[in-house]
Amino acid sequence: MAQQKKTIAVVNATGRQAASLIRVAAAVGHHVRAQVHSLKGLIAEELQAIPNVTLFQGPLLNNVPLMDTLFEGAHLAFINTTSQAGDEIAIGKDLADAAKRAGTIQHYIYSSMPDHSLYGPWPAVPMWAPKFTVENYVRQLGLPSTFVYAGIYNNNFTSLPYPLFQMELMPDGTFEWHAPFDPDIPLPWLDAEHDVGPALLQIFKDGPQKWNGHRIALTFETLSPVQVCAAFSRALNRRVTYVQVPKVEIKVNIPVGYREQLEAIEVVFGEHKAPYFPLPEFSRPAAGSPKGLGPANGKGAGAGMMQGPGGVISQRVTDEARKLWSGWRDMEEYAREVFPIEEEANGLDWML
């Protein structure tokens, strides 16, 4: 029997996570009701042309009527809010209330992030901690819910002068990445456009009977900065070097909130070398652990389990995502197949 097609409510539809889900969900016949802040721009125009997708334009802050409309007749919801839209805690709580009020939502997936201050002697990362507050609110409401934690987007890399993930093109044709991350500590990575949608669709297919209340790390690969640069070097056939720096260099105007985010990253990951995901269920052995339990390194890496703080049995951080979606794209493939195309679209010509 064919699976019943359902209606999915989505916010921030032009964002990488939401757009990835919309593309694959609509392609297999689901209907999507999606909020956008503007109908202008390449992604918004793309979404308008996709069958089975209905867009609702408007802000989320203090806009309960739009939220009620968005959830009308929806069976499923994927919610990824951003600080740029306004008070993220207020928006997140209002969305959860609206979903609960609709009475039709069978599974609510919320894109969360950790509050580091709750798990160790570290400050909170300001653009992440509000998401964790909203996660706890959703849990209290009793919505059938799952919480996904996205790794660092591969797609963040650019040779444009944006902070933290600039692959700077040097005069000799090589690239350098300057960031505060420890060069040898693995970080979680995700090709958001390619892999978020299929993974979320599988979570919805499995349903809350499998995933209710569960946290899932949406990361398919853990690589240290040195390993990332090695993957780029192999893909581009150019030397790519990582340089650890204590401070993120700011070359363009950025909002105050993002500047504060970068300052927290310098402290949490640069000075303190804190884990990216400090939650016990995402604990994983550090580099140098016994074979099979160390950081993932490429698609053939083995997997292991360990007991983390509080007795929580922790899967290797990539395991659940890889089981949800086996067609994931690794960093080397991204750097070879996608990075040059994105660069050319941004008006750059180093690859020609």
From Swiss-Prot:
Q: What is the effect of changing A18G?
A: 13-fold increase in the Kd for NAD; 2-fold increase in the Kd for NADP and 2-fold increase in the Kd for areA
Q: What happens when the gene is disrupted?
A: Displays partial derepression of activities subject to nitrogen metabolic repression.
Example GO biological process: negative regulation of DNA-templated transcription
The protein's UniProt keywords, in alphabetical order, are: Cytoplasm, NAD, NADP, Nucleus, Oxidoreductase, Repressor, Transcription, Transcription regulation
The effect annotated for Q202E is: No changes in the Kd for NAD and NADP and 2-fold increase in the Kd for areA
What Pfam families does the record point to? NmrA (PF05368)
Which residue intervals are annotated with compositional bias (Gly residues) in the record?
A: 295-311
Q: Where does NADP(+) bind?
A: N12, A13, T14, G15, R16, Q17, H37, N80, K131, Y153, N154, N155, N156
Q: What is its main location?
A: nucleus
Q: Which residues form the signal peptide?
A: none
Induction, per UniProt: Up-regulated in nitrogen-sufficient conditions and down-regulated in nitrogen-limiting conditions.
Q: Which GO terms describe its cellular component?
A: cytoplasm; nucleus
The record's subcellular location field reads:
Nucleus; Cytoplasm
Q: Where does NAD(+) bind?
A: R16, Q17, N80, T81, T82, K131, Y153, N154, N155, N156
What GO MF terms are annotated? NAD binding; NAD+ binding; NADP+ binding; oxidoreductase activity
Quote the subunit structure annotation: Monomer. Interacts with areA.
Family assignment? Belongs to the NmrA-type oxidoreductase family.
Described by its record, this protein's role is as follows: May be a redox sensor protein. Has much higher affinity for NAD(P) than for NAD(P)H. Has similar affinity for NAD and NADP. Negative transcriptional regulator involved in the post-transcriptional modulation of the GATA-type transcription factor areA, forming part of a system controlling nitrogen metabolite repression. Interferes with the interaction between areA and target DNA. Overexpression leads to areA inhibition.
Q: What is this protein called?
A: Nitrogen metabolite repression protein nmrA
Q: What organism is listed for this UniProt entry?
A: Emericella nidulans (strain FGSC A4 / ATCC 38163 / CBS 112.46 / NRRL 194 / M139)
